[in-house]
Amino acid sequence: MAKKNSKTKNNDNTIARNKRASHDYHLEERFEAGLELQGWEVKSLRAGKANIADSYIFLKNGEAWLLGATFPPLLVASSHVVCDPMRYRKLLLNRRELDNLVGKVERQGYSIIPISLYWKHAWVKISFALAKGKQEHDKRADVKDREWKVDKERMMKHSVR
């Protein structure tokens, strides 16, 4: 049986990740939403050009909006439409989910932080979380815990031998 070439097809549907989110925030409750996109944005996402690192989600007039995400336009896409790579993008959520988010953001002081942007079948979805900002000492404690975990694994590996 022939060995499959792993370089031919990437099974990971992720377009972009916000790697700093778990470092800068305590991520609590996760959600998934669709995005309202224009045609040139979909083409850009199919090419894998997106950045959600410095983005966040805000609520206005009972709607959720993605701000700060950059989808740079392709050179060959959409010559008749003005492409704004930093425009606000509407998130597609149920009324119940929106009401839940509004309550937690306004009353309990949460922020809404995007975690990843990915394909789900033919649709672009965004995964985001309710988050509270970490203080500097929280970040240091996380680094300390991570280093201790690595050291512990190393000690266990050498003690088995």
From Swiss-Prot:
Molecular function, one GO term: RNA binding
Principal cellular location given in the protein's record: cytoplasm
Keyword Cytoplasm included in the entry's annotation: yes
Subcellular location: Cytoplasm
GO CC terms in record: cytosol
GO biological process, one term: trans-translation
Keywords: Cytoplasm, RNA-binding
Classification via Pfam families: SmpB
Record flagged with keyword RNA-binding: yes
Database matches in InterPro entries: SmpB (IPR023620), SsrA-bd_prot (IPR000037), SsrA-bd_prot_CS (IPR020081)
Family note: Belongs to the SmpB family.
Functional summary from the UniProt entry: Required for rescue of stalled ribosomes mediated by trans-translation. Binds to transfer-messenger RNA (tmRNA), required for stable association of tmRNA with ribosomes. tmRNA and SmpB together mimic tRNA shape, replacing the anticodon stem-loop with SmpB. tmRNA is encoded by the ssrA gene; the 2 termini fold to resemble tRNA(Ala) and it encodes a 'tag peptide', a short internal open reading frame. During trans-translation Ala-aminoacylated tmRNA acts like a tRNA, entering the A-site of stalled ribosomes, displacing the stalled mRNA.
The protein's name in its UniProt record: SsrA-binding protein
Species per Swiss-Prot/TrEMBL record: Psychromonas ingrahamii (strain DSM 17664 / CCUG 51855 / 37)
Underlying gene: smpB
